[in-house]
From Swiss-Prot:
Expression by tissue: Expressed by the venom duct.
Miscellaneous field: Negative results: this peptide does not show activities on voltage-gated sodium (Nav) and calcium (Cav) channels as well as on nicotinic acetylcholine receptors (nAChRs) (at concentrations up to 100 uM).
Name this protein carries in UniProt: Conotoxin phi-MiXXVIIB
Function: This peptide promotes cell proliferation (EC(50)=17.85 uM) and inhibits apoptosis (EC(50)=2.2 uM).
Signal sequence, renumbered to the chain: 1-29
Disulphide bridges: 38-49, 42-51, 45-56, 50-61
Residues recorded as bearing 4-hydroxyproline in the entry: 44
UniProt GO cellular component terms: extracellular region
Keyword Kinase attributed: no
Protein location: Secreted
Keywords: Disulfide bond, Hydroxylation, Secreted, Signal
Family statement: Belongs to the conotoxin G2 superfamily. 1 family.
Propeptide: 30-35
Amino acid sequence: MRFFFLLLTVALFLTSITGDDAERMLGMKEGGYVREDCGSDCAPCGGECCCEPNSCIDGTCHHESSPN
């Protein structure tokens, strides 16, 4: 029973943090970023900003770099 109350207290503490920053910090906001955060040539992609020439595929930013 004590564990339940501890869990409830932690959950209430985390939800008491308000705003987009809390959602980003907790990973609840889709993508983690909004387009305004990423800049003009970048897009939100799976919690990070995916910028040209990289491409976002299935929520993962595939970094285009020199061939391995």
